[in-house]
Amino acid sequence: MSRTNFETLLEAGCHFGHLKRKWNPAMAPYIFMERNGIHIIDLHKTVVKIDEAAEAIKQIAKQGKRVLFVATKKQAKEVVAEKASSVNMPYVTERWPGGMLTNFPTIRKAVKKMANIDKLMSDGTYSNLSKREILQISRQRAKLEKNLGSIADLTRLPAALFVIDVCKEHIAVREAQRLGIPVFGIVDTNSDPNCVDYIIPANDDSNKSVEVILNAICGAIAEGLEERKAEKVDTEAAGESAEGEAAAKAPRKRGGKARAEKAAPAEAQPAAEEATEAAAE
């Protein structure tokens, strides 16, 4: 069953592309027609591509891996932050930090610096600093929070990127390609689909369009996380059951051995008596 449908996408305006003069010829297979100088996206193909991307991203989440959402354009910032947070995934909605992926250790150092500042505030050291130092540190903390706060929990490279506008986020896409990280993306008629592993042809300039697609994608991630959780519970239950069976069998073995040991002297007693009588004769 599809995660969305033609009518829902149509109502959200997912079919509106860019002006014909701005189109990328590589998007031709996903364009249905031209109307008033604007390309119209084939939503039947969009439905299929959403399902393909959702299934792939579900498997990534099921393995316990992270998906990094990237959307620095104004129309998509809020909805991406909301949807990514709902499934506990990291996101970047401010300026993309150059080297975020290719120079990840440096980014992690900046995140740790933010944690160290928080520690200063909590352990009382902060109050011993001068007003000027406190102001400088506070500004630095605010800047780090703005740019890196949403990826503070990202301790290793993400397993995938989900990009809202591959044209605008070309630096992030290029870094992911260099590292072999799969890219999922909403691709409008002015973008190149060849730089994306899982393309979702749709309007990337509309808040409603982005929200409808993210509902399907984040729904798939939530399913993957739930299935992972259920499998973990089943595995633990199976382990406890196996331990219980082993414990139940162990006493019976010891009891059987004890009974055998008790029976042995009883059987040996008549034999000893017979031997004594024979010796007396």
Q: What do the predicted segments below correspond to?
A:
Residues E267-E281:
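Long, low-complexity, intrinsically disordered segments
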Residues M1-R66, T72-K73, K77-L120, K131-I134, ...:
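N-terminal cationic and glycine-rich segments that engage phosphates or anionic surfaces
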Residues V67-L68, P90-T93, F162, P182-I186, ...:
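Short hydrophobic alpha-helical runs that function as membrane-insertion/retention elements
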Residues K131-V163, C167-F184, D188:
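Extended, charged alpha-helical interaction scaffolds
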Residues C14, K45, T72-Q75, E94-L101, ...:
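Short, ordered loop/turn segments at secondary-structure junctions
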Residues G13, F69, L161, I213:
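Residue-level signature of catalytic and energy-coupling elements of molecular machines
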Residues I171-D234:
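Short glycine/threonine-rich loop/turn motifs
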